[in-house]
Amino acid sequence: MAKYKPAESDRSSIKSKKPKKEVSASEGIIRAELLRNVTAAASKILLPLMLIIVSLLLFIGPFYRGLFFPLELLVANTIIFGLFFIWGLFRFVKSDSRFIGSPLDICLLLLLFSYLVSFLGFAVNKRDALEELLKIASYLSVYLVVLDICRHWSIQLPLRRSKSNNVGIVEANEKVPPGLNLVLHIILASATVIAVASLGVAAGHWDFIGAYAANRIASPMGYANTAAAYLMAAYFLSLALAPLARKMLKIVYLVPAVLMMITVILTFSRGAWLLLPPLAVLMVIAASPGNKIRAVLYMAASTIPALPVAFWIDPIFRSDMPSMAWLPIILAITAALLLGLAAELFLSLENRRKRTVFIFSAAVFIIIVIIFIIIPLVTPISLETKPGEPEQLQSLMQVVDNIKPEGHYKLVLDVKAEMDLTTDTESPDFIWGVKALGEIPGYRSVKLLEHHGQSTSGWETVTFDLETGPETERLSIELYNRYPGTAVTVRSVQLLSPDSDTRLHFIWSRLLPDRFYDRIFSFSRDRNMDRRFELFADAIKVIKDYPLFGLGGGGWAAVYKSYQDQAYDSREVHNHYLQVWIEAGIIGFLAFVGIWVSFTLAFLKKCFIMKAPPSRWQHWTAVFMPVAALGAHSAIDWNFSMAAVGIFLFALLGAGRSLDYDDNFESSINEKKEGSIKKYLPGLIGVVFGLALFIYTLILYSGLQVTWRSQELFEGGNIKQSLVEIEKAIALDPYRAENYHNYNVLIEGQAVRMQNQAELSKMLALAKRAYELEPYNPNYLSRYGTLLLNYVDTREGLNYIDRLMELRPHYLSGYQQPAWSRLSLIEYYFQNDLPGPAMEYYKELYDIEARMQADYGNTRSIAYVIGRAAYLNGDNNEALRYLERVGETDSNYNDAQEIITTITGEDN
């Protein structure tokens, strides 16, 4: 049989097919070992590096004014995006494909996406929108990094319990992420440092800008309310971590808790004070089984000493020796530790003995309250300044609500006043005093009564008549004593009217120091609340106009003055949920709300529905409580505008997300084929975007530095070099409108002097670009409108300038430039014998006046403009009517008087 000879094509086909090289078992083992070594190296180098960087951000960030201002924020963003690049490398070598695995992940990505969309197509301040977008991206980066640190860290803290105790099961069997405890302790330590630093500023040891202002602790972040929210969240973190520690190490967590509680109290943040009680109840509900009683006892152990010590040290901080405040603080810490020790001993007792101890402790507590609080409160009021003591005002106050306007009231009190003067002491003007103030709209007070009394012969009944005005809303009654050697005792204080008999006990004023009573009950409380509601109402107006995509980061600051019903300054909404809606639209708002909703649902599902083991449950509590505290406080303030607080929050979210895993999801990850490209995708994203954003933020940082340098050169008179630097700044940071504005201002003189059309066009283009980047900025709008008016088209320029009345309806500047621009045109046309156009602009002045009267309520500031225009038009009577309204403080007063003199001289 003839042998088969393949065709030429078959031969070529056979030659081209090389047999696959089989990998021997030993080579496979070597490759696997190499992969394990690379992965181990990544864990040993990259993971600790990420932990160090996150720790530095948590510890150092708040000291740089909370990373609120542009320079500090850019530096932080650059570091964070470098951190994100490292995270990408870590994910790549770990071949970890996990990326979106929970509703929280989706909410965070949607939040970032919504800010990106608003920046690209709807931002009214491009530079601020870019800054906010980068800030959200940095928050997400911190979240992902902390999540992986919790997942992959392997070194355990010695503080963690190693065997079963009254919390429950051995922790190793409860699937708690290995790095979670470490991360939470780093977060707690960073907040403890801030608490100590804040108290140290008040004690006079060191100083940070705005850290202790208006006798309120504001922390190195410089804003008291945000400091209160931050430390309140850390307070609950500290108490939630305590049950996870070994034996008596639990009480150590009371030390930071006491420091934080004292600091929160001394921030004088009414919002934080208001939220503490409901959050305390939530803490008990959220605590793991077996730790609910401990939660109550530990909150009591930290609050009972902290509250009186805060009252004690507040005046010490304001004295000549503020450092003496540390002694009461140390006493508070000692008392808290003793109470914590007592709590642990109580929890270790059998149930029968617990009941006995509880009944005994409750009885002792009631007796103490009766002796030290109830009895003093039912005794007569006593105010005394002893002989030899310095002159000082001692007072008690009570605010009375539900006061009838135009009502007749009688203030009746029994008084006993005494005087005991030393031989070298002059007789005082009075021994005691009583004052009544009536609150009227506008947060103003009207004095209805002030009486200075002398000594009495025993008890005397004194009666005062009070007549409230037509707008009086409530009364403030104050009793006081001032001079050494004088004392007054008052009992049975009554406020009588035909309809009611109100007894005044001054209970809260007797319990609380003056500053605390004033902070809680004074008229300023209503002013603060009313302003908050006014902000919220104006925010809703903005949302109604831009509900879908928002206005980009900085949107509220750009437009709020166009929506307000009265003038106020507030670049933040004081409600971060509404602010996100304004900036990122409905998707951003839902995503932001979804962060708390999804996190809460995950906590409820894992702990209350699936019944997580006690230790894992308590870890959930440790991350849930501070997140809930920050979320609640952010409904009344702008905490997350400070990047340091945002980093704090997103580190907590990342830590909490590490607890929210699904066994089926985890196993599906582990079963992925080794060669799948998907497992490298998150790492590639981190490497590419991390590196790109790192470089981009470095460029923006350089642009900011060059911008400032150009301004310094301009102020120093070096115009030529300033222009060179501005061009560099524009190239580095093309969204910064101030550079375009400064550039066109600098070149105007030369362009006009040389009548260079190219330079004039360049000047207009620069002014237009500045306006386009920030169309709600009155300076850029005014500048562009003025240039159009002077060099292009008068009517077009006026149309832009007239927009100032829309942008600033409650500010003088919004009306003055439109009016003065028309006066300039009127003067020009009359000088050139063109009365027709002059009359057109003259009539428009009255339109501006009518609009100003309707929106601003007072047109006196443009009276000179209209009066001069009337004078130029020959209408002397009209000119006098307006010019006589020009006040002496007006810069045009002398000119107005000259015109008046001229007119009256002509008439004579």
Q: What is each PLM-predicted segment?
A:
Residues 59-68, 576-584, 619-649:
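Membrane helix-loop boundary segments at the extracytoplasmic
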Residues 256-268, 629-635:
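Membrane-interface alpha helices of multi-pass inner-membrane proteins
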Residues 249-252, 586-621:
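Hydrophobic transmembrane alpha-helices and their immediate junctions
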Residues 426-432, 460-497:
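Extracellular beta-strand ligand-recognition surfaces/modules
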Residues 1-188, 238-254, 276, 280-394, ...:
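Transmembrane signal-anchor hairpin modules in multi-pass inner-membrane enzymes, especially those
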Residues 206-241, 271, 319-329, 452, ...:
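Membrane-interface segments at transmembrane-helix junctions in multi-pass inner-membrane proteins
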Residues 223, 418, 513-573, 577-580, ...:
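TM-adjacent membrane-interface loops and short helices in multi-pass inner/ER membrane proteins
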